[in-house]
A protein has these predicted regions:
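Multi-pass membrane proteins that catalyze or facilitate reactions on polyprenyl-/lipid-phosphate substrates
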Residues: 1-287
Length: 287
């Protein structure tokens, strides 16, 4: 019997693609859904983690392609900065360092804590509890966010506003991403919440979250890709490919929707959803 069926792979892949950009915890949903549907999938099993590697790589690739023109500008801005050609007004150069500073602590803490956190909190009950916590955090961020937002000079200057964040704020947001290793806590929710508290608008915070997530998710996926290609990936490579395709499609749709959604809307509905879904799962699992 296959450890993951192709139908399950499509559903889990599509769910990963949707829930990674949304501030609702992709890892939490990957733990909760199989339990709710009665699937015989062990979340701590090597084959399941290998499957998730494929879907995360697909998500990171789509994020890179979606923001490819932005990444080109950021890359050339970074090159100007190390060659000493960047000016204080060079938005792309400063944005590059904002992303680098936010990525480093996330990577270090992720490598140090990933196995321990996932082992401690990978149970469906723990994931439901932390999903509820995630919801309350989103609601609290909207309540206590900094107002007015960081000013800009007009339309289309979101990168300029993001680049005006302090390096200390970027470092703190990057370190806080380690919380997303706990199933139920959302990486995009943490980064967007940090951006809002730093004074960004919802739209700019979402954009910053997507840019910051790309190297973090991509690096984590590449580091674990040998597991999928090695013996631990035996029996799930076909399902992983199907799941990755599903994740790629839904990631693109989710990012496109959210960038438009956050032009005029807030995090609150996602906070309410997380609280309701988390409490519902806790009740179901306790019966």
């Amino acid at each position: 019997m296959e450890p993951i069926s192709y139908l399950q792979a499509i559903i889990l892949g599509a769910l990963q693609g949707l829930s990674e950009p949304f501030p609702i915890s992709s890892l939490g949903h990957a733990v909760l859904l199989p339990k709710l549907l009665g699937w015989n999938i062990h979340q701590n099993a090597d084959y399941f983690l290998s499957f998730l590697v494929a879907t995360h790589c697909a998500t990171a690739l789509v994020l890179f392609i979606y923001f490819f023109e932005d990444w080109k500008r950021i890359w050339f801005g970074f090159l100007r900065s190390i060659k000493g050609r960047a000016t204080p007004a060079d938005t792309d150069s400063r944005l590059a360092w904002i992303i680098i500073i936010g990525t480093i602590p996330a990577g270090i803490l992720g490598l140090a804590l990933e196995h321990k956190l996932r082992t401690l909190f990978a149970s469906p009950t723990a994931a439901a509890a932390f999903l509820t916590v995630n919801g309350f955090l989103l609601l609290a961020v909207e309540r206590f966010r900094r107002r007015p937002p960081i000013p800009g000079d007009g339309e289309g200057d979101g990168d300029e506003r993001i680049a005006k964040m302090g390096f200390r704020q970027a470092l703190g947001i990057g370190a806080a991403q380690a919380l997303a290793l706990i199933p139920g806590i959302s990486r995009s929710g943490v980064t967007m919440g940090g951006g809002l508290l730093a004074g960004l608008s919802n739209e700019d915070a979402a954009r910053y979250g997507f840019l910051l997530a790309t190297p973090v998710i991509g690096a984590a996926g590449v580091l674990k890709l040998p597991e999928l290609l090695g013996s631990t990936g035996d029996g799930v490579r076909g399902q992983a490919l199907v799941g990755a395709i599903a994740a790629a499609i839904t990631t693109w749709a989710a990012v496109k929707f959210l960038l438009r959604y956050f032009e005029t809307n807030r995090l609150s509905p996602f906070g309410i959803y997380c609280v309701c879904a988390g409490v519902f799962c806790l009740v179901v699992f306790s019966v």
